[in-house]
Amino acid sequence: MNQVKTAFLLVAMTILLVLVGQVVGQMIGIGSAGIYVGLLLAVVMNGSAYWFSDRIALASARAREVTAAEAPMLFRLADRLAVQYGVPRPRVYVSPDPSPNAFATGRNPSHAAICVNDGLLRILDEEELYGVLAHEFGHVRNRDILISSVVAVLAGTITLIANVAQWGLMFGGYGGRDDRQQGAGGALVGLLMIILAPIAALLIQLAVSRSREYEADRTGAEVSGDPLALASALRKLERATQVIPSQTAQPAFAHLYIVNPLSGQSMAGLFSTHPPIEERIRRLEEMAGGMRRAS
């Protein structure tokens, strides 16, 4: 199902970029040539989204791949989880960001990466770190990582389109002198793009993020056998991200993280890409109670 949704998003990106190419072509006076520019851009963006979305996400976080000698505990826990999940151990990255957080990315379990922020390593104990890694491995095994990474590129593309439309309105004029009405119509569409594009990008992120976080919480807690450790980690991360702003997280990639990296910013909670931490913790505590009763 995730593969079908990913294909749908790639097709949607193609259609969007072709339409945008047509509108921008009218705005800057190149006519239907804008359609071909949009199609070419769609080919480039779709290829980048599928093959390089993980590299884009990791570069955005300024993450560096680490070795077992540099991060022995991370590798020990990751190797253990790889066996439990029955997947290859993902590549391990560390971001210098002091705001504690983590995310998984990649095309599939054989081409996956897990990134943890330096701030996370500083505040979590081993059990909590294990719970967070188990959550991220859940995304890998559930094959959430490709669609989430593609959505990140799509959201970034939509934001870029809004910026291009803004520059087109400022400097592109309103089409050729012989076609003022068409140019004015293109300008109106461009203005609507500026207003609606960021909202569309956010709605796409919301559509793929919230339910997957609940599922990764459940999967991670089941595999680790310790829902309360993950619940404790979520409490710490939620408090810390409120007071330690992220230095690397970009809005287009916010939905990848285990907790919203932009939660400390104004208006961030209005359309959060993540479900409420309180509800996630409640579900984990309920799981822990069920495990105790079953034992």
Each PLM stretch: what is its role?
Residues 1-15, 26-36, 41-188, 199-295:
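Polar-ligand-bearing catalytic/cofactor-coordination segments
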Residues 16-21:
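Hydrophobic, membrane-inserted alpha-helices
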